[in-house]
Design a protein with these regions (language model features):
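Nucleotide-activated donor-dependent transferases that construct or modify glycoconjugates
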Residues: 1-15
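Extended catalytic core of nucleotide-activated donor transferases of GT-like folds
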Residues: 15, 20-28, 32, 37-125
Length: 125
């Protein structure tokens, strides 16, 4: 299975995020025979602007996701902690590739309303 895993891999942390959940999930999927393309949303958003800020580069990172999906044609898009990702991107993915499944993982507590709002925005997809 081809999987696009969109999460916060912390590529700019020089190995400090070696044991983070997103890396463990990707490693487990690879060990089970899947091809996994890791997309570090926050790092890519920072690269998308001269000011190196996530918020200003989020639009660019969202466009990059669509380019990757067009090249990779994944069977599964797995999303974790990509709080600046646009739900519109998922809508476009489902329109272009209706067979592609979209899954979401989250490890933060759900008693905070802004966390629930984020999850609700993605739930239709």
């Amino acid at each position: 299975m081809k999987i696009l895993h969109i999460a916060n891999f912390g590529f700019n942390k020089q190995g400090a995020h070696f044991y983070c959940t997103d890396r463990k999930i990707s490693a487990g999927l690879v060990e089970n025979g899947h091809f996994v393309y890791d997309f570090s949303f926050r790092d890519m958003a920072r690269m998308g602007t001269i000011f190196k800020t996530k918020k200003l580069g989020a639009s660019w990172a969202n466009k990059e996701i669509l380019k990757i999906v067009n090249n990779l044609e994944p069977d599964l898009v797995l999303i974790g902690h990509s709080d600046l990702m646009s739900p519109e991107v998922l809508k476009q993915i489902k329109q272009q590739y209706p067979e592609t499944k979209i899954a979401f993982w989250y490890v933060d507590p759900l008693y905070l309303e802004h966390k629930l709002d984020f999850i609700r925005a993605f739930s239709p997809y």
